[in-house]
Regions:
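Catalytic cores of glycan-processing enzymes that make or break glycosidic bonds
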Residues: 1-214
Length: 214
């Protein structure tokens, strides 16, 4: 089946991206790569081997699409503020005490910030608090752009400053409006398609995510 997929992709000039996140055997990733199918790497999920350190940008896969976050995560601004923990607690789907989740999450975020600083895309003095959050978001996208991955992607919600999750795993529509959340700016004002490029954050993130220098 993978061979047929690869053949059809070659015939039509199509790039195929596999979502190989989570519990996927390395042998599967190797087989997909053998057929030229790109994998997926998410900055927030990437550890350096079995350590608690973040993976260096140079150690990312070539045959992959790299993103800062995913559709199952809140926008980056919200993630920095612990919005993913707060929302799950409010919805009653948090399986551990919020304090435990928050402590672990902050430790991991700090590991990522340390790597960003090591690679020179984030000032070590910057902290992920309201005054510096946008600098952190920009640094994350510069980091993604610095990887050797074949493709990178920037989430639209990040480019307009939205803070609401588009999808909350483990819930149904009666608990959370999955995939029905309108695109808004940081002030929760609706953003229309024709207005996206004029958003203040759009140009900043586009420059940060551009390869070869912002």
């Amino acid at each position: 089946m993978v061979g047929i997929l690869a053949l059809e992709a070659q015939r039509t000039g199509t790039v195929v991206i596999g979502e190989d996140l989570g519990t996927v055997e390395e042998s599967v990733r190797g087989e997909l790569a053998r057929f030229g199918i790109l994998g997926t790497n998410v900055v927030w999920f990437e550890k350096a081997g079995d350590t608690e350190n973040a993976r260096a940008s140079a150690d990312y896969r070539r045959l992959a699409l790299v993103a800062v976050g995913t559709h199952d995560m809140p926008p980056t601004l919200s993630y920095l503020r612990g919005g993913h923990i707060t929302l799950r607690e409010e919805l009653g789907v948090l399986t551990r005490p919020a304090e435990v989740e928050d402590a672990e999450d902050r430790a991991w975020q700090q590991a990522v910030f340390n790597q960003l600083a090591t690679e020179g895309v984030l000032d070590p003095a910057v902290t992920p608090r309201p005054d510096d959050e946008l600098a952190v978001v920009e640094a994350l996208h510069r980091f993604a752009a610095a990887t050797p991955a074949a493709l990178t992607v920037t989430n639209l919600v990040d480019m307009v400053g939205d803070t609401r999750a588009q999808n909350q795993p483990g819930t149904t529509r009666d608990l959370y409006p999955n995939w029905c959340v309108p695109l808004c700016d940081s002030q929760q004002r609706p953003v229309l398609l024709e207005d996206i490029a004029g958003q203040p954050l759009f140009a900043r993130l586009a420059a940060a995510a551009r390869r070869g220098g912002g």
